[in-house]
Amino acid sequence: MIRLGNQMCRQVAFNIQTVFRNPGTANNPRLITRKMTQQRPPVNWTTSIPNQAAKDKEKIAPLGWFLLLIPATTFGLGCWQVKRKIWKEQLIKDLNKQLSTAPVALPDDLTDLAQMEYRLVKIRGRFLHDKEMRLGPRSLIRPDGVETQGGLFSQRDSGNGYLIVTPFQLADRDDIVLVNRGWVSRKQVEPETRPLGQQQAEVELTAVVRKGEARPQFTPDHKGNVYLYRDLARMCAATGAAPVFLDAVYDPQTAAHAPIGGQTRVTLRNDHLSYLVTWFSLSAATSFLWYRQIVKRIPF
């Protein structure tokens, strides 16, 4: 407004000078008006004073900044799951590597085995076949690590059977441990069907240290000597064994119809990929909504 007033004052002064210089124009007001109209520069009606109300309206309210925590937090959780995934995959690789290391002797204190899962150990003793148990049903894991699969009408070749768990009396001590001797088909679950595999003499074997399993959800109770999962406490109570569970490794010289060893699979829950996809998706969606609603103020 001040700039506009200065422009008008200069124009009026110019016109007064024109009248004095040209007395004839004093008696012709239209001529003066026409000259003022022709010579006056275009007026800029915009003001230089900022519109404070409009600027305040464009500011993000504290609630808007608070809502930004949602996409930021979910993004952070996604990054955390990426780190967890890398850690879990490396842990699985390390455990698989332990399966190929040289076996060690069974420690004097069997409680030390709790920190030795997937380690190879050597044991010597004899099997107590009269207390044999079954674990399953399970699919056969071949020596190359591939688990056999089959359909409903091909059970004969599907690898569907049971793991034979037998108490093992150690030769150099009074302790009894549980040994998963390996897999047998449904046709060989009864000991009478595999007499060559029921060794009575003292043997030496290599096995993998395992832990017990928690009861899976919706799993029914065990029936007799048939167990659905590695219920270590109940197995030990039924056989008088120490809480030690070992998986016998694969032996290419296994007798015909004897349990097939090497039924160990490194099983660690690794759902971090699905978790990180979920968190990053939530972060992207909430970031878009926050920008649309808080920054651009676009209604739905």
Swiss-Prot record:
Belongs to the SURF1 family. GO terms for biological process: instar larval development; mitochondrial cytochrome c oxidase assembly; phototaxis; visual behavior. It comes from the Eukaryota. Disruption phenotype: Lethal at larval stage. Larvae show reduced locomotor speed and response to light. Results in smaller muscle fibers with mitochondria defects. RNAi-mediated knockdown is lethal at larval stage. RNAi-mediated knockdown in the developing CNS, in the eye and antenna disk from early larval stages shows increased lifespan with reduction of COX activity, increased succinate dehydrogenase (SDH) activity, reduced locomotor speed and response to light. The chain crosses the membrane at residues 60-82, 271-291. It is found in: Mitochondrion inner membrane. Its main location: mitochondrion. Pfam families: SURF1. The keyword Cytoplasm does not apply. Keywords: Membrane, Mitochondrion, Mitochondrion inner membrane, Transmembrane, Transmembrane helix. Probably involved in the biogenesis of the COX complex. It is a multi-pass membrane protein. InterPro entries: Surf1/Shy1, Surf1/Surf4. One of its GO terms (cellular component) is mitochondrial inner membrane. This is SURF1-like protein. The lineage of its organism: Eukaryota, Metazoa, Ecdysozoa, Arthropoda, Hexapoda. It comes from Drosophila melanogaster (Fruit fly).
